[in-house]
């Protein structure tokens, strides 16, 4: 039986301290099983890990935060083309609800993406999430773009690390204002900022 979900769409400025605290706990529990390093950014009430989202879709059930997706509009470079996108990140579904939340969160976010007038939305996830993201892309809602790496700046400066990192991740593109055929070709996406 599917749990009753209540969805909240909110701009970052609308979140209260209690919202950030609850979201930080959600992310620690959701990302923690993938490694303690992945949960560390959410210590101290941080509800973001790299770049801070401007808009969030948060799903709640009787037990609190159940699912989350953040959005940040930015220009990226794909090959030689600069492109305005809505980056989707901070994707999460509480472990006991896996298979139920992400599809619903993109469906809640999709009309907002259309209102924002962006040509594309894109996200980057670990290859281990291929099956989950594949379900999200069924029916032509999105496309998994293979063979693309993403270069980002680190969210903090470390004297012992280079200022950028290039990752081999799974890139997912959602055509919003333009058809998928207009997504630029290229094997490298330059975020020109930290990941969301």
UniProtKB/Swiss-Prot annotation:
Molecular functions per Gene Ontology: acyltransferase activity
EC assignment: 2.3.1.-
The species this protein was found in: Sinorhizobium fredii (strain NBRC 101917 / NGR234)
Family statement drawn from the similarity comment of this UniProt entry: Belongs to the NodA family.
Name this polypeptide is given: Nodulation protein A
Keyword Cell membrane annotated: no
Coarse class of the protein's main subcellular location: cytoplasm
Superkingdom, natural source: Bacteria
PROSITE patterns in UniProt: NODA
Cited InterPro entries: NodA, Nodulation_prot_NodA_CS
Stated role: N-acyltransferase required for nodulation. Acts in the production of a small, heat-stable compound (Nod) that stimulates mitosis in various plant protoplasts.
Entry's Gene Ontology cellular component terms: cytosol
Keyword Acyltransferase: yes
Location in the cell: Cytoplasm
Keywords for this protein: Acyltransferase, Cytoplasm, Nodulation, Plasmid, Transferase
């Amino acid at each position: 039986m599917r749990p009753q979900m209540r969805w909240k769409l909110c701009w970052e400025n609308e979140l209260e301290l209690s919202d950030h605290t609850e979201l930080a706990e959600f992310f620690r529990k959701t990302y923690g099983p993938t490694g303690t390093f992945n949960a560390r950014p959410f210590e101290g009430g941080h509800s973001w890990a790299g770049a801070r989202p401007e808009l969030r879709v948060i799903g709640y059930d009787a037990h609190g935060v159940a699912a989350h997706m953040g959005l940040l509009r930015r220009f990226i470079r794909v090959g030689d083309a600069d492109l305005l996108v809505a980056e989707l990140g901070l994707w999460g579904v509480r472990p006991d609800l896996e298979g139920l939340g992400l599809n619903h969160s993109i469906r809640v976010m999709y009309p907002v993406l259309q209102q924002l007038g962006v040509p594309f939305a894109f996200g980057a996830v670990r290859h281990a999430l291929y099956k989950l993201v594949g379900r999200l892309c069924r029916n032509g809602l999105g496309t998994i773009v293979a063979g693309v790496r993403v270069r980002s700046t680190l969210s903090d400066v470390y004297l012992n690390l280079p200022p950028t990192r290039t990752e081999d991740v799974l890139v997912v593109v959602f055509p919003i204002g333009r058809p998928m055929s207009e997504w630029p070709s290229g094997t490298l996406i330059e975020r020109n900022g930290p990941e969301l």
